[in-house]
Design a protein with these regions (language model features):
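Conserved Rossmann-fold NAD(P)-dependent oxidoreductase catalytic core, especially the SDR/UDP-sugar
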Residues: 93-134, 156
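Flexible, glycine-rich beta-alpha linker
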Residues: 117-118, 156-174
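Mid/C-terminal beta-alpha module of Rossmann-like enzyme folds, strongest
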Residues: 212-274, 303-312, 319-321
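Substrate-positioning beta->alpha
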Residues: 168-174, 188-211, 219-223
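Active-site Tyr-X1-5-Lys
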Residues: 130-156
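NAD(P)H-binding glycine-rich loop region in Rossmannoid oxidoreductase-like domains
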Residues: 50-88, 101, 119-123
Length: 321
């Protein structure tokens, strides 16, 4: 049994990760500014703001974890300035400061984001950044702050790709809802190929980093996700097939008009499932070289087909779809 601290433990990834760690009989403390998604996590939850160093220090030092998995962050794209994403910048600096004081710390995994580069851009190396959102810029600073701090303990940065599964939030839970409601349409040949990742496979990769030798993971950066990219067309058909739904094709021009309409509604703060930003993401190939993490975690435990069925079953149970 090991002692784990999970920041951002009330989020989608954190909730699933904590479930796995508890099932494996590890000791866990979860910190977040939001209440847990699962009532079973209430006893291990500590309400802590990463931007409050004193509060953070009190909880972490009293717990004295051996392993820290840092998932806590602001991840939406609605912020207007870098100050809006201070959890990803000042919060990370606070965490680095506190972790230096731990006596029994063995490894830390820091979660960054694939959005340190815009979709479709292939970086030359892990120091090549090209963010297209303020959120992405904040995650670039997350990585730079960690590297500049250069902690003495074993540390790894991971860049989650498009991770999905039970407890997920927008945009992928919305994608599932639209498909399962029969309101999704293919956009012909415009569909793209992307790296996605089922949550159980992501957790397997994280655990593989934790259990790997120091020389294989220390000061390293890994993209995490499923090893074969998906086409959104085939995945949507797979989701729809769980409910015997037939997806039809409509002209791409209709999506362009819908995106323009969505942009207009966004100006008056009305949500709409399609915007120009989302349409561009849906039609831009975006896949990554996962060969390095595959060396550490060669056999993903869950196929896309099984993950899709498990996720649909979860949505039926929780959203009455």
């Amino acid at each position: 049994m090991a002692k784990f601290l999970i920041t951002g433990g009330s989020g989608f990834i954190g909730t699933n990760l904590i479930n796995k760690l508890l099932n494996d009989n590890h000791q866990v403390v979860s910190i977040d500014i939001k209440e847990p998604k699962s009532k079973e996590h209430n006893t291990i939850f500590r309400k802590v703001n990463l931007c409050n160093r004193q509060e953070l220090e009190s909880v972490i030092l009293s717990y004295d974890p051996a392993y820290v998995i840092h998932l806590g962050a602001r991840t939406d794209l609605n912020g207007k300035t870098l100050e809006d994403y201070d959890a990803n910048i000042g919060g990370v600096k606070n965490l680095l400061f506190v972790l230096d004081k731990l006596k029994n710390l063995k490894k830390v995994i820091f979660a960054s984001s694939m959005y340190v580069c815009q979709p479709g851009y292939v970086p030359k190396d892990f120091n090549d950044f090209m963010p297209h959102t303020i959120y992405g810029e904040s995650k670039v600073l997350t990585e730079k702050n960690i590297i500049d701090w250069n902690p003495k303990y074993t540390w790894t940065i991971v860049r989650p790709t498009s991770i999905w599964g039970p407890y997920f939030d927008e945009p992928y839970n919305l994608f599932f809802k639209i498909v399962l409601s029969g309101k999704y349409f293919h956009m012909g040949s415009k569909a793209c190929k992307k790296t996605y990742g089922y949550i159980d496979n992501f957790i397997y990769q994280v655990e593989s980093i934790i259990t790997s030798n120091k020389d294989l993971v220390d000061h390293k950066v890994f993209y995490l996700g499923d090893y074969e990219p998906y086409t959104i067309t085939s995945w949507a058909d797979e989701i729809a097939g769980t409910k015997n739904i037939k997806i039809h094709n409509i002209p791409y021009s209709v999506f362009v008009i819908a995106a323009f309409f969505g942009d207009c509604l966004k100006l008056v703060r009305i949500k709409f499932p399609m915007t120009s930003f989302r349409l561009k993401n849906m039609t831009t190939n975006n896949f990554f070289d996962l060969s390095e993490i595959k060396k550490l975690a060669p056999h993903l435990p869950v196929s896309r087909n099984i993950g899709t069925k498990q996720t649909v079953d979860w949505m039926v149970a929780n959203y009455s779809i």
